[in-house]
Amino acid sequence: MEALRQRIEAAFEARAEITPNSVEPSVRADVEKAISMLDKGEARVAEKIDGQWHVHQWLKKAVLLSFRIFDNGVIDGGETKYFDKVPMKFADYDEARFKEEAIRVVPPATVRKGSFIGKNTVLMPSYVNLGAYVDEGTMVDTWATVGSCAQIGKNVHLSGGVGIGGVLEPLQAGPTIIEDNCFIGARSEVVEGVIVEEGSVISMGVYLGQSTRIYDRETGEVHYGRVPAGSVVVSGTLPSKCGTYNLYAAIIVKKVDAKTRGKVGINELLRIVD
């Protein structure tokens, strides 16, 4: 894999000269290999190593190169047709393969090739972009969007209309990450590389970006870009420094461990007790 990484890095430096007609066959083959690895889950844009998330920038570069290398083509879509550079992940699947991978895909869910979908995953009418990683046992509910290179953990529930932001550029930006056993409430948005740590519950209509203040009401701490593990988060406001107005904030109203979360329903966790 190291040799492939080096070749992708070199091709990316020369990307300005690359077109679908001029690309070297070896470069095309390398990019296709990288996309295939992402598609199969053999590689991922980000992975947790020794408790820390590490981003493999060369895989993001491979995704960006694919847009320069591949030309638009007609894509069959049931009752209609599409015209794009990226084919659909399930275009060649048959009944046996869906059963083998234990994936449910409800029309008109759209999943682009180069994204990984784990076993026992349910995709309601939703969208998963290339480079994304959706782990086992996850539900992507109706009109939810998983952006490019986003990382979704095991047994996650992305409720209706949830937006998980994609990050391809700038290259130094990390992907948005939802760790294992999280619940993201309807119409919430998690973007700009925010990390929602394991076992957290995000209420309906919470918006999390790098500049969002995430206030822990029990400790008074303010977090940016990270929701600590086991947090229960709702929308709220915090006063301005001058005290004349309030600005949006996400409020951590309580912390729960896995044992408590397993015994108590999501709705019960979201009931705020003053």
UniProtKB/Swiss-Prot annotation:
Keywords, sorted A to Z: Acyltransferase, Amino-acid biosynthesis, Cytoplasm, Diaminopimelate biosynthesis, Lysine biosynthesis, Repeat, Transferase
Subcellular location: Cytoplasm
One GO cellular component term noted in the UniProt record for this chain: cytoplasm
Pathway: Amino-acid biosynthesis; L-lysine biosynthesis via DAP pathway; LL-2,6-diaminopimelate from (S)-tetrahydrodipicolinate (succinylase route): step 1/3
UniProt enzyme class: transferase
Gene3D superfamilies: Hexapeptide repeat proteins, Tetrahydrodipicolinate-N-succinyltransferase, N-terminal domain
Stretches of the chain forming a coiled coil according to its record: none
Annotated residues for binding of substrate: 104, 141
Any GO BP annotation: diaminopimelate biosynthetic process
Keyword Cytoplasm annotated: yes
GO MF term set: 2,3,4,5-tetrahydropyridine-2,6-dicarboxylate N-succinyltransferase activity; nucleotidyltransferase activity
Segments passing through the bilayer: none
InterPro entries reported for this sequence: DapD_Trfase_Hexpep_rpt_fam (IPR005664), Hexapep (IPR001451), Hexapep_transf_CS (IPR018357), THP_succinylTrfase_dom1 (IPR023180), THP_succinylTrfase_N_sf (IPR037133), Trimer_LpxA-like_sf (IPR011004)
EC annotation from Swiss-Prot or TrEMBL: 2.3.1.117
Protein origin, superkingdom: Bacteria
Catalytic activities: (S)-2,3,4,5-tetrahydrodipicolinate + succinyl-CoA + H2O = (S)-2-succinylamino-6-oxoheptanedioate + CoA
Subunit description: Homotrimer.
Designated name of the protein: 2,3,4,5-tetrahydropyridine-2,6-dicarboxylate N-succinyltransferase
Lineage of source species: Bacteria, Pseudomonadati, Pseudomonadota, Gammaproteobacteria, Alteromonadales
